[in-house]
């Protein structure tokens, strides 16, 4: 038997026409979506990057920079949380935002009322102090004071009362300002968490799914 017959016989048994060695296709590596562990690792990496950004920024001495750091922390927390917990916190945060903004508006109205009270008390205190000072340098005014004892008592009483109101209102206004700052920071944290929870993650980029009007039902 010659070589041509041997090759033809081998081809017939292997089902390959015109080929001595059978063709074996190379294996294909199909692209697959990232696994859950990979996505979790990527989310943790982004969370760590956000925290590093917050820590490496400026010292945060002003209120706006402190709010920025709180927002960074809320974003990082949202990326660390599992999806079910993230969605629960998102829904609760949206409901809480409305109440926080109402409280913030109430505190601002109280502070405005205290400012008016401080202004009026300051004007009365200044006026009564000026009258008392003039009575020291002017003998005629001092004589009128002595003749009208009730007027002297009234002026001194108003001065003492308005000074007390001025000091008390100033302390209350400072406390309300601290509460306003804390409430604004809480609002910034919740808005940032809701924004981060509304983003989709594909391993490379973040994309906001929908615009959320915080605090509105």
Swiss-Prot record:
Belongs to the orbivirus NS3 family. The gene is Segment-10. May play a role in the release of virions from infected cells. This is Non-structural protein NS3. It comes from the Viruses.
